[in-house]
Amino acid sequence: RRVDIEPNLLTSGTATIKGQPTGYIYILATESTAPALAALKGTGKLVKIGYSTQEVRERIKNAENDRTYLEAPVRLLAKINCFNLNPQKFENLIHAFLYQQRIHISLTDKNGTTYHPEEWFAVDRDTAVAICEKIVDGTITQYRMDKVQGVMVKKG
């Protein structure tokens, strides 16, 4: 699997009003006490990476009632302001780069329905932020994920 960044992919169809971001990439940690998450939480390598076109605090205010956030409170670890780029496309690139780090677990929601979280990854905050930086500066193609360690490493 690889990530190719096409020219203007991140900026197509977006324009920032002076001083206002087009959206945000956010990196969250969960406060969930689900036993299936305990081992990952213990390593410090469990983050949700998402995007929002509204303020992140507004987006996550009802996390306890949303399976997207594992029906638990979340902590904001990082917020990246997106200026003159499409935050959804940016998120898609991040998720593609982290494909091998996506967690594969089943959880049961408050209604007893089984679900599979999709935007949660077995990486730490610093790795997630570094990936975002490398996508923005155009050097992400020089890196790959070490799937065992869950860190980004330079190719070659």
Annotated model-derived regions:
Residues R1-G156:
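Non-catalytic accessory segments flanking enzymatic or RNA/DNA-binding domains
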